[in-house]
A protein has these predicted regions:
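Membrane-proximal linker segments that couple transmembrane helices to downstream signaling/catalytic modules
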Residues: 2-101, 105
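The DNA-contacting recognition helix of HTH DNA-binding domains
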Residues: 58, 110-112
Length: 112
């Protein structure tokens, strides 16, 4: 009986390690799409669209983002948008733009 329990424990540990590795890999892909490819600039780029791009499902996206950031998908996307907006607002290059225009350029869809 002890060997059976030990075997099951090792099997569970293996599954957990695989899950962690897959979660890490998916998070890297999420960051690649959002941060590097700047897909967040599209106001309609949803978790569902990201899941389609990554050949997974939106639930996995939500779980992985939550595990790695403590936030949800929308908070992650808005974080990227806010960083861009802050950078643009500080830049003399964008001094002639309104806050609303900058927000729209950063992927926000409205003034709300």
């Amino acid at each position: 009986m002890k060997d059976s329990n030990t075997s099951k424990s090792k099997e569970r540990a293996s599954y957990a390690r695989i899950r962690d590795e897959l979660s890490d890999k998916l998070f890297v892909q999420i960051v690649e799409k959002l941060g590097v490819e700047k897909r967040y600039l599209d106001p309609d780029y949803s978790a569902k669209k990201l899941a389609i791009d990554l050949h997974t499902n939106p639930r996995y996206i939500s779980v992985v983002v939550g595990l790695h950031t403590g936030d949800n998908y929308n908070a992650l996307v808005n974080g990227y948008r806010l960083r861009d907006a802050c950078r643009m607002l500080r830049s003399p290059r964008y001094s002639e733009y309104t806050i609303e225009e900058i927000g729209l350029m950063c992927g926000f869809s409205s003034r709300q």
